[in-house]
């Protein structure tokens, strides 16, 4: 065989001498008139182009040297090549990949008469023409076709014609058709595999028998998933991977926890007995299993373990915590992997080493095509800011979703079909063939190692019981479950196979099973002896209960000035857009005289000082490099060459990395990714910015299930910062509201901080405070309503002195107002942009007497600043009422959350009332004129006696 790689896309390699001459002559006829040759030849010429002037060098051919001048013979060759291509492309349709639904096979697809061929025709075709990577036993064309059928239509099948990269397709052809990907298991390895399957099955049987009727979401029918995970983890660690991350739903999770993560059986049994002995558990944050104070059901919990291979290589294996929201853990695990791959200890962009971490995502067959977050996550796989060098996707395919069958759950032939749009190679494998399953995993890992791309395995099995163990599946799928109940388990099938080969005897098989059951029974009895009937509710850690520490976050003026000057130095040859350069250079004057620091500069200075302190930063979002409102400009573009320059990545005094990326048009996957990144890199200030805050609800599942509650459920800390542009400016219901009320309704137990700042200095200080609490027990997410039109408003800009001293203030009092304490009758509380609108009115009507009113801005809405407000209230003895003023409708914004808190903070007998929009189903008006009228009304009524 030639040393050059060939595929069936190079069909002319089988022609030489006179035969090649005939092909050349026919091609010349085709060029003159395509209709002058037969349909098959025309199709061949269209697909493969002209024959070469000379045939490629050959080292093997079964073709005789006899001259061929008959075009019919060429037609036979073309037909044979077409057959070979069809086997490669459509062999999966005839493959034995369904353990239960055998009738789906289309075994007659490759009958020779369908292609106008006989065995004699094919036998004369050179092997190289049909299967250039065939093993030595393939002697002629017929052998080659039979070999291809053996390769592509048995218990493992392949789809990769949708992969456009020729090198990848050639590699896959070679690996598959040569058999290089197949495991060469020794007798001991086969026995070990049987032992593993016995562990998996025995565990499920024990749970089923011991904890009757309790939910466990059994793996039975997909038992081979566990040895597959064993194998891929082994290969990854052997290749130097130091972090392997797994994301999966509840199906089979307990088995994976027990056998892949090594979660002790006694812990799992204790969870079934509702008698957890927490004294046995590792402390929060250590490698092991963490529990929050409210906890979660056993089949949602994650775990960590340290693993070591035979070469003493060490790695961390992580199974991510996961709620019942199927597939949403996928981008979180990708964030884990990216965080583990990056070195953030040096200035500049983080340095990524993809071999440091490998992500494995286990999907459900109904959820993979059903949940949009799947394709959002797949879309990240090749993006600069999000790629992780290839993930392994495994669809745990039991051909059903609860009670919904495939014809009601997807519009595609396979549940894996959405992956084709991302050119991900797909392997379908019968879960009843454990050795084929290991082969699929090996191929997947080798592909990732070589091409640094995703790979998908469709593990096709069945579900032995109902969706959960209290469900009776025969009610809705009676026919299928008649078959399943008679179907032997994969352990039974594999043990019989080994017995038949003489590798093991039946007595040893039974002994393995007995040993597993004896061990489980012994552990269970020990668990019963140690059980406790105490069910005391846990409480949050004291660091959470006590709230955030009071930290001075000011930075010396000289330091800020030096940083500012350095960030405005660009490479000599770099040409910034002239208009932008003029705007940015104005920042040079900020530190001279009475200069003001606007919002964007305050952010940049905060970032620079945080980097100087040694804290890495990662900022992503749609248009975040420039900023939606053209205010940030953290990445500059050369107006002549389109080269880019990020001043913060060139900052000489940084002691950690800085990353900023424009994200794809996605909220769900991106918020999940950034949350995962921050969880795995807790020392990093990770910020996600919505294009407009209105679009943050595209990630509502992430906020509900992870960001707000992850620590309470799982002990999973996060310091993620979410920047949500918010404010009513006449832009309609889709560009006004970040749905502040939704974040406030989730606020409890000091789970996160919610702020709406009205000055650049406040933003500077809150960012620095957030960076200071990272990787401590006081850490929590920060949800920030950020400005839009106020970004350039001078009333929001701050003096340099405000950045150099003090700290973030939870409340701000309106300057030059409320100075006559005895005269104040009304205190107006507000938050965000409405405060600036009120200030504008007072300044516009400065000739009026405003001594009767005082305005207080609530900069931090949660935790609610009760004590600071009470101190303010106490200064005004003649106050008659406290008014909460807001832009948002009455059933939205902060009012539904703060009204009871204000009443509890207010002096006895003081009326607390509301000013703002009325109750609405839509957050804002679409007509800018009506918007303006409403804004004017709110301001007027708030400031009218």
Curated annotation (Swiss-Prot):
It is an enzyme of class 1 (oxidoreductase). The keyword Oxidoreductase applies. It comes from the Bacteria. The keyword Oxidoreductase applies. One of its GO terms (cellular component) is cytosol. E1 component of the 2-oxoglutarate dehydrogenase (OGDH) complex which catalyzes the decarboxylation of 2-oxoglutarate, the first step in the conversion of 2-oxoglutarate to succinyl-CoA and CO(2). GO terms for biological process: glycolytic process; tricarboxylic acid cycle. It catalyses: N(6)-[(R)-lipoyl]-L-lysyl-[protein] + 2-oxoglutarate + H(+) = N(6)-[(R)-S(8)-succinyldihydrolipoyl]-L-lysyl-[protein] + CO2. Homodimer. Part of the 2-oxoglutarate dehydrogenase (OGDH) complex composed of E1 (2-oxoglutarate dehydrogenase), E2 (dihydrolipoamide succinyltransferase) and E3 (dihydrolipoamide dehydrogenase); the complex contains multiple copies of the three enzymatic components (E1, E2 and E3). This is 2-oxoglutarate dehydrogenase E1 component. SUPFAM superfamilies: Thiamin diphosphate-binding fold (THDP-binding). Its EC number is 1.2.4.2. Belongs to the alpha-ketoglutarate dehydrogenase family. Keywords: Glycolysis, Oxidoreductase, Thiamine pyrophosphate. InterPro entries: 2oxoglutarate_DH_E1, 2oxoglutarate_DH_E1_bac, DH_E1, KGD_C_sf, ODO-1/KGD_C, THDP-binding, Transketolase-like_Pyr-bd. Pfam families: E1_dh, OxoGdeHyase_C, Transket_pyr. Its cofactor is thiamine diphosphate. One of its GO terms (molecular function) is oxoglutarate dehydrogenase (succinyl-transferring) activity.
């Amino acid at each position: 065989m030639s040393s050059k790689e060939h595929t069936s896309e190079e069909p002319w390699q089988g022609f030489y001498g006179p035969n090649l001459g005939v092909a050349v002559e026919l091609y010349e006829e085709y060029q003159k008139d395509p209709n002058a040759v037969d349909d098959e030849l025309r199709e061949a010429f269209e697909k493969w182009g002209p024959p070469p002037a000379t045939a490629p060098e050959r080292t093997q051919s079964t073709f005789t040297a006899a001259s061929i001048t008959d075009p019919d013979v060429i037609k036979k060759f073309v037909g044979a090549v077409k057959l070979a291509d069809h086997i490669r492309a459509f062999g999966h349709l005839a493959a034995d990949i369904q353990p239960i639904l055998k009738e789906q096979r289309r075994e007659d697809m490759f009958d020779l008469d369908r292609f106008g061929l006989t065995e004699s025709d094919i036998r004369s075709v050179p092997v190289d023409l049909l299967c250039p990577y065939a093993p030595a036993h393939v002697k002629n064309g017929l052998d080659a076709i039979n070999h291809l059928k053996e390769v592509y239509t048995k218990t493992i099948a392949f789809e990769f014609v949708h992969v456009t990269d020729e090198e990848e397709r050639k590699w896959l052809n070679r690996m598959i058709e040569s058999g290089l990907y197949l495991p060469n298991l020794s007798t001991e390895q086969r026995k070990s595999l049987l032992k593993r399957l016995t562990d998996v099955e025995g565990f499920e049987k024990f749970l089923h028998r011991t904890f009757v009727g309790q939910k466990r979401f059994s793996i039975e029918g997909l038992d081979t998933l566990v040895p597959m995970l064993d194998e891929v983890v082994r290969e990854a660690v052997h290749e130097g991977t130091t972090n392997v991350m797994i994301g999966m739903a509840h199906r089979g999770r307990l088995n994976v926890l027990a056998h892949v993560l090594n979660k002790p059986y006694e812990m799992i049994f204790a969870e079934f007995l509702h008698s957890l002995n927490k004294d046995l558990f590792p402390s929060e944050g250590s490698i092991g299993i963490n529990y929050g104070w409210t906890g979660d059901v056993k089949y949602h919990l994650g775990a960590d373990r340290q693993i070591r291979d035979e070469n003493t290589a060490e790695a961390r294996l992580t199974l991510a915590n996961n709620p019942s929201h199927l597939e949403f853990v996928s981008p979180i695990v990708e964030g884990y992997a990216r965080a583990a791959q990056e070195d953030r200890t040096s200035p500049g962009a983080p340095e990524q080493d993809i071999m440091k971490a490998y992500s494995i995502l286990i999907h459900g067959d109904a959820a993979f095509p059903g949940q949009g977050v799947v394709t959002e996550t797949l879309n990240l796989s090749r993006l600069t800011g999000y790629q992780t060098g290839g993930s392994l996707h495994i669809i745990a395919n039991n051909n059903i979703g609860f009670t919904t069958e495939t014809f009601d759950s997807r519009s595609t032939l396979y549940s894996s079909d959405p992956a084709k749009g991302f050119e991900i190679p797909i392997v379908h494998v019968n879960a009843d063939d454990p050795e084929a399953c290991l082969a699929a995993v090996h191929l997947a890992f080798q592909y990732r190692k070589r091409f640094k791309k995703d790979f998908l395995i469709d593990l096709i099995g069945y579900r032995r019981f109902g969706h959960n163990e209290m469900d009776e599946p025969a009610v809705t799928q009676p026919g299928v479950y008649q078959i399943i109940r008679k179907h032997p388990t994969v352990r039974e099938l594999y043990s019989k196979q080994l017995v038949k080969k003489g590798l093991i005897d039946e007595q040893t098989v039974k002994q393995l099973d007995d040993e597993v059951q004896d061990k489980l029974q012994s552990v269970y009895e020990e668990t019963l002896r140690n059980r406790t009937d105490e069910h005391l509710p846990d409480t949050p850690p004291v660091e959470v209960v006590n709230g955030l520490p009071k930290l001075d976050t000011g930075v010396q003026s000289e330091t800020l000035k030096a940083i500012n000057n350095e960030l405005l130095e660009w490479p000599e040859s770099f040409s910034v857009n002239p208009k932008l350069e003029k705007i940015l250079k104005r920042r040079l004057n900020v530190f001279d005289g009475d200069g003001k620091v606007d919002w964007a500069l305050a952010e940049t200075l905060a970032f620079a000082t945080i980097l100087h302190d040694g804290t890495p930063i990662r900022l992503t979002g749609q248009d975040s490099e420039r900023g939606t409102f053209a205010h940030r400009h953290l990445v500059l573009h050369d107006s002549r060459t389109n080269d880019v320059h990020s001043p913060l990545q060139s900052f000489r005094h940084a002691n950690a990395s800085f990353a900023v990326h424009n994200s794809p048009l996605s909220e769900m996957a991106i918020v999940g990714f950034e949350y995962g990144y921050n969880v795995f890199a807790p020392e990093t200030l990770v910020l996600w910015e919505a294009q407009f805050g209105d679009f943050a609800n595209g990630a509502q599942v992430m906020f509900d299930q992870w960001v707000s509650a992850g620590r309470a459920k799982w002990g999973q800390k996060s310091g993620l910062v979410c920047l949500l542009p918010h404010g009513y400016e006449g832009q309609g219901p889709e560009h006004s509201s970040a749905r502040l009320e939704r974040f406030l309704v989730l606020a409890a137990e000091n789970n996160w901080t919610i702020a709406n700042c009205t000055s650049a200095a406040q933003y500077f200080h809150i960012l620095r405070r957030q960076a200071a609490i990272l990787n401590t027990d006081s850490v929590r997410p920060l949800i920030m309503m950020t400005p839009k039109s106020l970004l350039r408003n001078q009333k929001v800009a701050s003096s340099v002195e405000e950045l150099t001293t003090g700290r973030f203030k939870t409340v701000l009092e309106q300057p030059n107002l409320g100075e006559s304490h005895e005269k104040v009758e009304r205190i107006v509380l507000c938050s965000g942009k409405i405060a600036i609108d009120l200030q504008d009115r007072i300044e516009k009507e400065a000739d009026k007497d405003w001594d009767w009113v005082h305005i207080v801005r609530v900069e931090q809405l949660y935790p609610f600043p009760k004590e600071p407000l009470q101190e303010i209230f106490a200064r005004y003895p003649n106050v008659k009422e406290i008014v909460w003023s807001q832009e948002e409708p009455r059933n939205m914004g902060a009012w539904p959350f703060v009204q009871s808190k204000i009443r509890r903070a207010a002096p006895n007998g003081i009326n607390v009332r509301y000013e703002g929009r009325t109750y609405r189903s839509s957050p804002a008006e679409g007509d800018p004129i009506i918007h303006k009228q409403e804004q004017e009304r709110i301001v007027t009524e708030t400031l009218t006696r």
